[in-house]
Swiss-Prot record:
A GO biological process held by the record: pyridoxine biosynthetic process
Cofactor note: Binds 1 FMN per subunit.
Protein name: Pyridoxine/pyridoxamine 5'-phosphate oxidase
Organism (species): Actinobacillus succinogenes (strain ATCC 55618 / DSM 22257 / CCUG 43843 / 130Z)
Keywords linked to the UniProt accession: Flavoprotein, FMN, Oxidoreductase, Pyridoxine biosynthesis
C-alpha cells in the first residue's frame, strides 16, 4: 500500500520564541487550555513510551490527570508492562498530538511514583465500575477469554458493593521533565519547533530546525 501521496500543508498558526512563556509548564498549560476550548478529541490523551530491561521500547496512550510545577501525572497498574518497564528504567517520553490545531508537544524526563495518599485520593474519585476494573484486570496478562475478566469483576463487585479500596498494585506516576518541545505545523514543512531543556535547574529555550 503506497501512502506517499497523503500529505497536508499546515497553515493555521505560528509559534515564535517571544510569544512562548519562560516556563514550559506554563506554555503547556496555555496550549492545553486552547486544545480544550477548540474541542480537540481527547485533549489530555498522551502517548507514553518506555524502555524495559530488555532494551526494547514500547508505547501506548494514557490520559494526563494533572500537570503541575513538578511535572505530568498519570495513573496505571504497577504490574502492567509499562509499570515493569518503569521499575527497571524510570524514564519516559510523552507525546501530545492535537491535529485540529496542527500542534504536538514532546516531553522527556525521569519518572517517580506518587505517594500513596495522592493515589488513594485519585482512586476514590474514579467511577465505581472503574475501581472494580482495577482489581479485576491483571493488566497485560494473557487470559483465556472475556468471561474470565467479567467473572472477576462480578466477584469484586460482590465483595465491595459500596466502597472499593485502591489495589496496592495500582497508583500514580509523575514524569519530571528535563526536555519539553512545542511543535507547530507550518507551510512547506518549515515547522516551528521550540525546545526547552533543563540546564542547572534553569530552563533554556531554543529554536530547532524542522
Amino acid at each position: 500500500m503506497e501512502l506517499h501521496d497523503i500529505r497536508e500543508d499546515y497553515t493555521k498558526r505560528e509559534l515564535s520564541e517571544k510569544h512562548c512563556a519562560a516556563d514550559p509548564i506554563k506554555q503547556f498549560e496555555k496550549w492545553l487550555k486552547e486544545a480544550i476550548w477548540a474541542k480537540v478529541n481527547e485533549p489530555t490523551a498522551m502517548n507514553i513510551a518506555t524502555v524495559g530491561e530488555n532494551g526494547k521500547p514500547t508505547s501506548r496512550v494514557v490520559l494526563l490527570k494533572e500537570v503541575n510545577a513538578q511535572g505530568f501525572v498519570f495513573f496505571t497498574n504497577y504490574l502492567s508492562r509499562k509499570g515493569k518497564s518503569l521499575a527497571a528504567n524510570p524514564f519516559a517520553a510523552l507525546n501530545f498530538f492535537w491535529p485540529e490545531l496542527e500542534r504536538q508537544v514532546r516531553v522527556e524526563g525521569h519518572v517517580v511514583k506518587l505517594d500513596e495518599i495522592k493515589s488513594d485520593e485519585y482512586f476514590a474519585s474514579r467511577p465505581y465500575t472503574s475501581r472494580v476494573g482495577a482489581w479485576a484486570s491483571e493488566q497485560s496478562a494473557v487470559i483465556s477469554g472475556k468471561n474470565v475478566l467479567l467473572a472477576k469483576a462480578a466477584l469484586v463487585a460482590a465483595q465491595h458493593p459500596l466502597n472499593v479500596p485502591r489495589p496496592p498494585h495500582w497508583g500514580g506516576y509523575i514524569v519530571e521533565p528535563d526536555t519539553i518541545e512545542f511543535w507547530q505545523g507550518r507551510p512547506s514543512r518549515l515547522h516551528d519547533r521550540i525546545r526547552y531543556r533543563l540546564e542547572n535547574q534553569i530552563w533554556v529555550k531554543e529554536r530547532l530546525s524542522p
